[in-house]
Design a protein with these regions (language model features):
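A glycine- and Lys/Arg-enriched "phosphate-lid" helix/loop adjacent to the NTP-binding pocket
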Residues: 231-267, 274
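Conserved lysine of the Walker
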Residues: 152
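ATP-dependent small-molecule kinase phosphotransfer cores
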Residues: 169-230, 262
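Glycine-rich adenosine-cofactor-binding loop
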Residues: 1-19, 146-148
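Rossmann-like adenosine-cofactor binding region
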Residues: 35-100, 219-225
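Adenosine-phosphate binding glycine-rich loop
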Residues: 80-140
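NTP-dependent small-molecule kinase module
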Residues: 129-137, 142, 158, 162, ...
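NAD(P)-binding Rossmann-fold cofactor-contacting core
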Residues: 20-37, 171-178
Length: 297
């Protein structure tokens, strides 16, 4: 049983394909039709959900058309939105362990078929896969997390230079927007107020694509920041021995660093896709990160 969210042109195409694939039933969910978002309970046995609405699309990231927990038999989710790479719907599927797919592959396949029609010749099917992977690499953000002073800003700048990307720094952005240093903002307003500012900035930076993003050491203490960074990014945890972390100009590092690390360690582990040893040279760190990134074909 398949549910198709939305009743526009893309919905008609998806319904045609599902029927061609002999889905047992295909139901269109719209805002005002007989089957709508107010009576989704009647479709709790849905096994496939396809979102054809723009809900969750850039720049309005972070919202989802439905709560997947309403569908205990769900076996697959497709969201035709391709920006961000992982919509809120897709990320919930990921969290629940439900197989999912975003809309980028569909976009590339559609472009391939369009090119064939206009150019009058066939294009190898393998080109769809190649271009899909290439676009995925180019659009993906590379995000750096880690303790204060672990080298995130330095590594981000060098990595961006090596990959011909733009480096963004959440702390620098906070300071530019507020006309004050992060240290003074924390001392003046307290850590909780600073974290709220930080989450706003991270939400903005995370919506962008193809960037290298250095984050503040404490951003992992707010779970909402994970979705902002994960939606378009691969996240690297830069690890550096505590005795090598600088403290000057960092009010939150002035106390017990070991206690801070113990408190945050599980958060770093939760956020990170990869863990990188940053006790050596910047070049060694760059090599580790580059080795973890998908290779070009």
């Amino acid at each position: 049983k398949a549910l198709v969210l939305g009743s526009g042109g893309a919905s008609a195409t998806v319904c045609a394909v599902l029927n061609e694939l002999r889905a047992r039933s295909v139901t269109v969910i719209s805002r005002s039709g007989e089957d709508n978002y107010g009576n989704l309970d009647r479709h709790a046995d849905a096994e496939i959900i396809v979102n054809t609405t723009p809900v969750g699309m850039y720049p309005n990231c972070g919202v989802s058309p439905v709560d997947l927990r309403q569908f205990p038999r769900l076996a697959g989710v497709l969201d035709i939105v391709y920006n961000p790479a992982r919509t809120a719907l897709v990320m919930q599927a990921e969290t629940l362990g439900i197989p999912y797919m975003s809309g980028l592959y569909m976009l590339v396949a559609q472009a391939k078929r369009t090119a064939e029609v206009f150019e009058g010749h066939a294009i190898l099917g393998s080109e769809t896969e190649r271009i899909w992977k290439k676009l995925g690499r180019e659009m993906q953000n590379i995000v750096l997390i880690g303790m204060p002073g672990s080298g995130k800003s330095t590594v981000a700048a060098r990595l961006a230079e090596a990959l011909d990307r733009v480096a963004l720094d959440s702390d620098a952005e906070i300071e530019e927007r507020n006309g004050a240093s992060c240290a003074s903002l924390i001392e003046r307003n307290g850590e909780a107020a600073f974290r709220a500012l930080e989450s706003e900035v991270i939400a903005d930076l995370g919506r962008r694509s193809g960037m290298v993003i250095a984050t503040g050491g404490g951003c992992v203490t707010r779970e909402e920041n994970y979705a902002s960074l994960h939606q378009n990014g691969v996240i690297f945890w830069l690890r550096r021995d505590l005795d090598k972390l600088p403290r000057e100009g960092r009010p939150l590092s002035a106390g017990d660093l070991a206690a801070m690390y113990d408190k945050r360690r599980a958060c770093y582990e939760r956020f990170a896709d990869h863990s990188i040893n940053n006790n050596g040279t910047v070049e060694e760190t760059l090599r580790q990160i580059m080795a973890a990134l998908p290779e070009e074909e």
